[in-house]
Amino acid sequence: MSAIRDYVMQHDLFCHHDHHQSYAAFDADREDYTFDSLLGYAWADLTTAAGPRAHTGETSRQAIERLWPAIRLTGYGRAVDLGCRALFGLPYAPEHFDAITEALQGAIRGRTAAEVYTYFVHEKARNRWTIHDSIDPVGSPERLDPTQFPDSYRSAFRMDSLFSIADDEPIDTLERFTGRSIHTLDQMVDALNAAIDRAATTGRLAALKIGMAYGRDLTVGDPTHHEAELAFNRIRNRKHFWGGIQQEGAAVDAAAGRALGDYLFHAYIRRAADDDLPVQIHTGYLAGNWGSLNGTPASRLIPIFNRYRTVRFDIFHASWPWTSELGAIGKNYPNVWLDMCWAWAMNPGQSARALAEWLDCVPFTKIFAYGADTRLPWCNMGYSLQAKEGIARVLETKIDEGL
């Protein structure tokens, strides 16, 4: 090993993005964790390997055994194998599935959920600090409870349903969470700010998160208050006849609702500016299968970066497959940081090329090189090793080139 590789491999990590379960949720499923709980994102590659005629979401042991050889060398597959070998001394292979389950259950047996997280996340993966994306804290307030996560975790507030709003479910959710009545657009913005206030009272709020790429494209318009109010009024007053039509669900279509969603997006960013909170945004590839990628490049957000120049934007997942494009954006916009969370697992080769390229054009202080983006604590092991190995290879090459 080289000196730089030794340094990287023993270094603690800041996990910039994770979705870990609360202690209570972890304990509820404690007896069900088996070899397949190590798979994480590899489930999507299993689906891809199965082909279009396979039963969607096939999860049987027989299916995993049959398909695993086809995916073991993908980024997802390699992360699973790396973690399994490091944690249990076993390659991830069908002939070891029972032994892996036994080893995993042995590791969590007799440990509280807090001790399980300490063991896997802190001691094994050496992730000393974590930004926790609770996905929907407004709909599930328990995800904001600081006693349900390690002290080293900080939270990112998120409510994506606001940005693709077509009915009153997000409004009702905000009412329940804040205890406020929402009858006007201005009251809705006030309730959104009150929800963020509630998250801040935990003392753990570190960022605002936007994952709307899973539900819509990233192009954001600049609607007026009146345009947004028209959509709000139609959604909130769905008992009325609008254009001769009365409908309970989906009171507006996507085009009509976009004005309201974009208006709330701007309100959200303004709140980040007021509180000096960074904004984490999902760009690029989407988890799972059949995602619509043409609306997800980070370049669609350039008008937002330009308008909100004092807001720090943390752009996720290397915007893969548009990594070079993101590098140019990071070089040009002082308020944009490049984030490689999840990227090493999606495509280790391209992630290494992206990091090497970015180091040639962007100040290294603008690059976040790791985030596991996992749901279960033991999955962090493989993703941490995968990132460290990739980072080490890139730095070794730079040093060999005389830099």
Give residue spans per PLM region.
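Long, well-ordered mid-to-C-terminal structural blocks that present hydrophobic/aromatic surfaces
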Residues: L260-Y333, W337
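Metal-cofactor-binding active-site regions of metalloenzymes
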Residues: S2-H266, R270, N332-N335, W342-P348, ...
